[in-house]
């Protein structure tokens, strides 16, 4: 009994407010009270009301919302609700929402303390969490885009996605406007150059966008140099391919009379472009004629382009994050501490992935139009790559050890990935230890075990044989698994995404397609190179897509800088504060190192790492 102060926060994005009236109920452990005053939410505003409650409520458990509409349902984006009372000395309660409120049903928001099933011995939240998961499983259904690939969210269009998974209006408008700009520029360039000759490497300058990236301009000027060619495999757009070789690859076949080259392999780089069913091709050497050696390197870079975009970027970044997202929404209620920890790192993933499936890798999409592996090859490559989705490969300490890159001083990706992993692991451990006091508490959490099994057995199609756990037995194992999930959705995706504009804008450095077969002789000329590299339209489309995906987004949220507060209480806030402190220290260290480098490596700079797979 007494006076309660209630503050309601509405989102700041376009259309977040509502013309509909909203009624509230306070639900306590001992009673429930309807708030007579109705509010009309205003975009970007906090609305405060006071209510004199006659009933004794006890500690508050829920706030219930009911949005009334007469003619039109006007959706409302609610950030949170704060309640203080009874009286000026009463307790404060925070009820996170961060979702759209639509329709005429009643929405119940639990108080923001993270609670496992074991934290609710009286079962006060049991019915709520069961009903929430039941509703979510109807909304979030597994789909199968292509046989043999890890599963995805069911749905063919944006409208098939739950409203809370779609872009907010601000991001949607910017994304679609920038896409339209890129396609318009492509059309203009195509029309202006339709009759011009395309017979010299300098002609690629016609479609190169200056002023977008200093590194891209350096690549344009220096791409023929062997040092830059090799550097890219350590710290370029795709740092996931390189591994230390302790013996010659079995696929490296020496043509008759060239066996003596084996002893020279330790001294200089050599390339071989094998063709299935054909006799061994020649080994291409830096001492070959310039155009011969350049063409061989272009083939290697084009192959890396395919592996990067499909395996490292799409599969290991986007699609893996989608599995984590769908499993989380199906298995963890919003009151669960693991849900609260991971949900900021799943924002926008389902829509950006759906756009990729319907625009980039769909039938007659970008890959089919201009990429070598289009027309079905990209699907086969993804299917084959699925066999390499091992648990260790998603964890940098294990992956870098397996690839022999630990301690390689020139691998800035390795250095930064390890430090970022360790920072995230400490952050995760802080939250885990707040909510799980023993290993037994982890083992007994049925919702947590269901979530882990859903990822490994369902989304990843039974990945136990590749090292993924299908149950979690200890706090350390939970910490490691959660760190893998968050690092995949943040740092790992960033390392595969941010380099596209820098390294792929100059098309000859990373051709999306090669129009002639791999060379079998050493008589290549400039004409051969130009006939093999992408034509004008293909190169223009590559440049346009690279800009669309690679340029910095104005509403980007940096790692750990999300404004949403899903947790209540001082403990989680202190853990997040420590994360931000450690990220700031890493930021300073990377900038200090980069100041001494000819080519700075900033793809894991915390201020540039997106908080989720959102682009």
Which positions does each model-derived feature cover?
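Long, compositionally biased charged/polar stretches
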Residues: 1-615
């Amino acid at each position: 009994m007494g006076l309660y102060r209630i503050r309601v926060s509405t989102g700041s994005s376009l259309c977040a407010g509502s013309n509909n009236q909203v009624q509230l109920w306070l639900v306590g452990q001992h009673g429930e009270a309807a708030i007579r005053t109705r509010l009309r939410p205003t975009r970007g505003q906090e609305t405060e009301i006071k209510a004199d409650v006659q009933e004794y409520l006890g500690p508050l458990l829920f706030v219930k919302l009911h949005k009334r509409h007469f003619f039109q349902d006007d959706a409302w984006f609610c950030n949170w609700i704060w309640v203080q009372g009874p009286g000026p000395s009463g307790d404060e309660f925070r009820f996170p929402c961060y979702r759209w409120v639509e329709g005429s049903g009643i929405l119940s928001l639990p108080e923001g303390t993270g609670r496992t099933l074991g934290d609710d011995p009286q079962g006060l939240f049991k019915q709520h969490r069961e009903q929430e998961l039941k509703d979510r499983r109807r909304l979030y259904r597994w789909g199968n885009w292509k046989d043999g690939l890890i599963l995805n969210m069911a749905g063919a269009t944006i409208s098939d996605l739950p409203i809370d998974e779609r872009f907010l209006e601000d991001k949607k408008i910017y994304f679609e406007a920038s896409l339209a700009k890129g396609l318009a520029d492509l059309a203009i360039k195509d029309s202006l150059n339709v009759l011009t000759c395309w017979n010299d490497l300098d002609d690629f300058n016609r479609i190169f966008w200056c002023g977008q990236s200093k590194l891209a301009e350096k690549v344009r000027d220096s791409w023929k140099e062997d040092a830059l060619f090799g550097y890219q495999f350590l710290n370029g757009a795709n740092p996931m391919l390189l591994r230390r070789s302790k013996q010659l690859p079995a696929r490296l076949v020496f043509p008759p009379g060239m066996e003596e080259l084996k002893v020279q392999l330790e001294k200089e780089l050599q390339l071989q472009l094998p063709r299935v069913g054909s006799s061994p091709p020649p080994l291409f050497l830096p001492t070959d004629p310039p155009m011969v050696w350049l063409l061989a390197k272009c083939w290697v870079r084009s192959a890396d382009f395919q592996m990067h975009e499909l395996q490292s970027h799409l599969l290991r970044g986007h699609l893996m994050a989608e599995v984590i997202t769908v499993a989380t929404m199906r298995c963890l209620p919003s009151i669960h501490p693991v849900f609260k920890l991971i949900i900021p790192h799943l924002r926008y993933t389902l829509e950006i992935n759906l756009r990729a499936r319907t625009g980039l890798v769909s039938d007659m999409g970008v890959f089919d139009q201009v990429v070598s592996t289009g027309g079905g090859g990209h699907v086969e490559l993804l299917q084959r790559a699925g066999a390499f989705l091992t648990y260790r490969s998603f964890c940098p300490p294990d992956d870098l050890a397996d690839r022999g890159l630990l301690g390689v001083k020139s691998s800035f990706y390795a250095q930064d990935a390890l430090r970022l992993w360790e920072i995230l692991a400490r952050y995760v451990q802080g939250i885990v230890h707040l909510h799980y006091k023993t290993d037994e508490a982890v083992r007994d959490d049925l919702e947590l075990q269901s979530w882990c099994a859903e990822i490994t057995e369902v989304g990843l199609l039974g990945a136990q044989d590749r090292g993924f756990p299908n149950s979690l037995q200890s706090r350390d194992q939970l910490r490691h698994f959660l760190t893998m999930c968050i690092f995949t959705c943040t740092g790992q995706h960033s390392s595969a995404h941010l380099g596209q504009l820098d390294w792929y804008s100059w098309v000859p450095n990373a051709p999306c397609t090669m129009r002639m077969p791999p060379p079998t002789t050493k008589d290549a000329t400039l004409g051969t190179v130009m006939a093999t590299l992408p034509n004008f339209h293909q190169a223009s489309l590559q440049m346009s897509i690279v800009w669309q995906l690679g340029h910095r987004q104005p509403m980007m949220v940096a790692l750990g800088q999300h404004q949403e507060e899903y947790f209540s209480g001082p403990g989680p806030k202190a853990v997040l504060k420590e994360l931000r402190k450690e990220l700031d220290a890493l930021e300073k260290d990377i900038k200090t190192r980069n100041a001494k480098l000819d080519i700075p490596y900033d793809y894991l700079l915390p201020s540039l790492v997106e908080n989720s797979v959102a682009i």
